[in-house]
């Protein structure tokens, strides 16, 4: 396990939502690309968008996971390597996989890539976890039906990093095992094309138009302490097809209660409901096998009265140290967290007329413009009789910020 209580894992159906959930407090984001994802009808990321997403997230210390969570035909395997290679080189943090053959192939193709098994793999016990570990799996996403007591036992017996769904839609059947949509309409959930027939009304014993297969949405925000005690590391929010306000709002509330460790207020719980729900919430799977109170019965539609404001883009705070001494190369060292970068210019010359003013130099360095950064503090060591042109100071700032940006983003697999 890593040195933090939880990873808050958020969905993103497009680049705008990805940026929004990161600004709202997500530790990691999962997305779908142009192939092999379980949301074939979503507006999935293009290659260009996904590469931008990886850079945006990594600059902020956030991880990106790519869904490869459908069953893949033999004829499609030849496309898998080329599809993933560009993201692997960019530093994609992990793939989320359903097909055991794909797990084996990715581990062979990209041995340093983390592999997370999808909930579509229906892992419900320690034996399944042990089986998967031999193929390089680094995290297992628990089936939604697994209780907290079972998760605790699985974690204690295997030591595997566990991820559990904490919020969002529930399937009536085990994810990855349901053929209802395939049989009824020829659209396979295992190929990302589920038609959701469980959300339709049915006649049972003469009773018409009852939604007997439509489950309420999950909400586990009141069980965070119990999830922690069960050994769950990653808390997954469902919703790659949800809107910006929903995704950002849910992330904001979970972020607040993960960090504060306070009991969830009734007012906030009601506000989370307003963001979106199906006839209320349930967390019964955490504690019981099932129950009739999990079913919506009267209406299956997702109701949202989202009124949460979209998060504003925040600048990333950095520190700077400016050194300008006569006869020595001028330098600007910038630091964010434990990442530093030093940029230099030609040796500083003596002033022929008016020497460089210290405040003016600091003000010049402070002009970060439309970059992602802003200085929280600049320490300056400037000689008494030196001169540096504004253009050189601008270049020093640009080079330092660009270098820090490249270093922060990194290239994890090359």
Regions found by a protein language model. Give the residues of each.
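Surface-exposed amphipathic alpha-helical tracts and adjacent flexible/coil segments at the periphery
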Residues: 1-24, 28-39, 53-54, 60-88, ...
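Beta/alpha (TIM)-barrel catalytic core signal, keyed to glycine-rich beta->alpha loops juxtaposed to Asp/Glu
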Residues: 122
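Residues at the C-termini of beta-strands that transition into short coil/loop
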Residues: 119
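Basic, amphipathic alpha-helical recognition segments used for DNA target recognition
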Residues: 105
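Aromatic- and glycine-enriched glycan-recognition loops and surfaces
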Residues: 42-51
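Conserved nucleotide-cofactor-binding alpha/beta core module
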Residues: 126-127
């Amino acid at each position: 396990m890593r040195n933090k209580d939880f990873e808050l894992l958020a969905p993103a159906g497009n680049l705008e939502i990805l940026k929004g959930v990161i600004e709202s407090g997500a530790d990691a984001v999962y997305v779908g690309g142009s192939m092999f994802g379980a949301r074939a009808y979503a507006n999935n990321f293009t290659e260009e968008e996904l590469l931008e997403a990886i850079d945006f997230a990594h600059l902020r210390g956030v991880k990106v996971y790519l869904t490869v969570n459908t069953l893949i035909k033999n004829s499609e395997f030849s496309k898998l390597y080329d599809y993933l290679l560009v993201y692997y080189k960019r530093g994609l943090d992990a793939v989320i996989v359903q097909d055991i053959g794909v797990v084996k192939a990715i581990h062979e193709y990209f041995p340093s890539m983390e592999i997370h098994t999808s909930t579509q793999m229906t892992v419900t016990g320690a034996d399944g976890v042990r089986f998967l570990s031999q193929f390089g799996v680094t995290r297992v996403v628990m089936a939604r039906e697994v209780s907290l007591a079972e998760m605790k036992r699985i974690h204690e017996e295997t030591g595997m990093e566990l991820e559990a769904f904490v919020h969002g839609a529930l399937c009536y059947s085990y994810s990855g095992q349901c053929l209802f949509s395939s049989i009824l309409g020829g659209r396979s959930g295992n190929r990302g094309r589920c038609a959701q027939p469980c959300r339709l009304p049915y006649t049972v014993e003469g009773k018409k138009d009852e939604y007997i297969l439509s489950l309420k949405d999950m909400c586990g925000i009141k069980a965070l302490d119990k999830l922690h005690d069960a050994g769950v590391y990653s808390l997954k929010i469902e919703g790659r097809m949800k809107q910006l306000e929903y995704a950002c709002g849910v992330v904001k509330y979970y972020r607040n209660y993960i960090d504060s460790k306070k009991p969830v207020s009734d007012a906030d719980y009601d506000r989370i409901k307003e963001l979106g729900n199906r006839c209320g919430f349930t967390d019964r799977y955490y504690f019981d096998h099932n129950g009739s109170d999990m079913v919506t019965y009267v209406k299956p539609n997702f109701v949202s009265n989202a009124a949460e404001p979209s998060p504003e883009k925040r600048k990333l705070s950095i520190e700077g140290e400016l050194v300008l001494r006569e006869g020595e190369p001028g330098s600007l060292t910038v630091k964010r967290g434990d990442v530093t970068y030093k940029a230099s210019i030609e040796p500083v010359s003596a002033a022929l007329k008016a020497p460089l003013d210290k405040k003016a130099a600091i003000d010049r360095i402070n002009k970060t413009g439309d970059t992602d950064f802003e200085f929280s503090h600049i320490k300056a060591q400037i000689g008494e009789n030196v001169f540096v042109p504004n253009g050189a100071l601008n270049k020093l700032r640009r080079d330092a910020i660009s270098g820090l940006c490249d270093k922060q983003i990194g290239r994890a697999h090359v």
